[in-house]
Each structure stands twice: as C-alpha cells, then as structure tokens.
Amino acid sequence: MKISAEALVETEDVKDIYLIENGKETKVGSTTEKIRFVRINGRDAIERVQTLNSDVLGNRKGITIIEKTTFRPISFTDYVNGTQQVKAEYSDEGVHISIKDSEKSIKLNGYYVDTFSVELILRVLPLKSGYSLPLNGFNATLESEVDIHIQVVESELFKRGFDEFVDAWKVKTYFGETLRYYWIDPASKELLKQSSMIGDGLVLEFCRG
C-alpha cells in the first residue's frame, strides 16, 4: 500500500504524561511534538521532533525524518539528557546505526518504516471500521526489525478540552508483542491520546489536555 504524508500539516502539540497504577492516575511529565516540512538532499521530507520531560521517565528527544511522499525513513536520532544515544541513517541498502562509540550497518529489504514514524502514519491512513494494515518496521534503538500490525477497534467519543467532544478512531497497534492504543481525530488528523500497558496493572498514557 502506498502511504503519503500529503494530508499532514505543520503542527506543534503538547500532551501530558500519566502513569496509571491499578486505576490511580498520576501526572509524571509532558511531551511536545513538532512537525515541520523540510528539504533533505533535494527530497521533500517531514521532520518530527518529540521531546519528553519527566522526573520519573527521564528527559529524551527523538528526531525522525521521513520522505513526504512515501514515508520511507531518512534518519532517526535519539537524545537522553541532551546527549546523543542513537543515530540511524537509512539508504536503499539498509540502515547505518551509530550507538555511542559503536557503529554497524544492517541490510533491509523491501518497503519498511521507522517505528517512530508510526504515530504520523496513523494520521493519514483511511481509517474506518474493520480497517487493518500490516507493516514492516525497524526500531533503531533495538537495532532490529519489528512486525507492525494496525487495526481499528471502534469509533469512540473523545473529550477534547473542557466542553468539546469528537468522534475518534481507537486504533490497536502491535509492535511485535508490544501493544499500544491510539485515538485519532479523523477530521483534524490529530493524535489525541496514546496508551500502553508497561507492567502488571501499570499503564502509561500521553493525553492532550
């Protein structure tokens, strides 16, 4: 399937981060996402910068750059407390990864996406009841390929702000064995919420205020 980012717009968004332990909710930080259009080596591209600030989860910044017309990955860079931890640079042959003082190249075949671009991909898919899509992914921090499976669960009334409600698609997404849920506003193409089980009775949520 051909995936294009033409429907996306440049945005800046802030979400609160919550840890929910056995039903008890605690705010533990915030995350900022900036999406902008750039030119990389003559190609139209999208740069997504996600910054996480949390005393509990740490301070991270991930920069994902993908081709605008195909969603093919160009690069991913991960920073922890301001220090670069991982740099992945993609080419037709595969991916070259630099982690601290070590480097390696991994051959990748066929069409694949960077796992950190999935939150962009979800916003441009033709989501509807019963929709599903498998993707081949690559996670640079894990240095491994990941099978991704996207499936629409249902349409759910989502409260946005104090008195605004929208019909959002609730989307179940597997990254290998890891399951996350996303809520997508089909009109604005906005990612409203993300939820994942990270331990026994422990849920991590990113939610628009």
Predicted regions and their residues:
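Acidic, serine/threonine-rich low-complexity disordered tracts
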Residues: 1-92, 133-209
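Surface-exposed beta-loop interaction hotspot
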Residues: 92-138
